[in-house]
Amino acid sequence: MANRDKMQKPDWMNDEEWAWFKERTSSLDLIRSDAKADVQAYLANPAGRAAGTNAQGGFPTLLLTTVGRKSGEKRTTPAVFMRHGKDLVIVGSLAGYDEHPAWVLNLNAHPKCEVQLDFDKYHAVSRDATDAERKALWPSLVKTFPAWGYFQMQTERPFAVK
């Protein structure tokens, strides 16, 4: 994304939401800091997070723990997700910045991961959605979290769908 100052307010946001949204996505450092705080808030009170009843913005949220591709250390991040059958689908948007989120790169290197839904923890193996799956899933993903559609318009980088 060349210039975040030129972002236009989406029709589905009011002015107050837009001001908050634009400020909270204004830098990668702020996004990363917020993610760390969100992990702590999730761990302190996980009930309802997976349903979006106890999460920022009311979106279904999980905790994803990956193995760092460089460090080999466990890294945990919150992720909005969508259920698709038995699968949990997440999107590597990083608020429309031109780089992939670290968790995408980590999963590309080490697909085995851990997922926490509310109090429940699971072992999982990540995979990329095929182009056909991504195309079929995208409208439902954007319905789940409209910002993904907005962010995708801000960059030429195709978002990872896992």
Show the residue positions of the predicted features.
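Extreme N-terminal tail/first-helix region
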Residues: 1-54
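Short, structured beta-strand-loop surface elements
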Residues: 4, 8-27, 94-148, 154-157
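Short low-complexity stretches enriched in small and charged residues
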Residues: 33-49, 73, 77-83, 116-121
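Intrinsically disordered, low-complexity segments enriched in polar/charged residues with Gly/Pro
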Residues: 49-55, 66-69, 100-102, 138
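Short helix-to-loop capping/linker segments positioned immediately adjacent to catalytic or ligand/cofactor-binding
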Residues: 50, 71, 148-152
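Short coil/turn segments at secondary-structure boundaries
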Residues: 54-57, 152-156
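Short beta-strand segments
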Residues: 58-95
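Catalytic adenosine-cofactor/nucleotide-binding cores of aminoacyl-tRNA synthetases and other
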Residues: 162
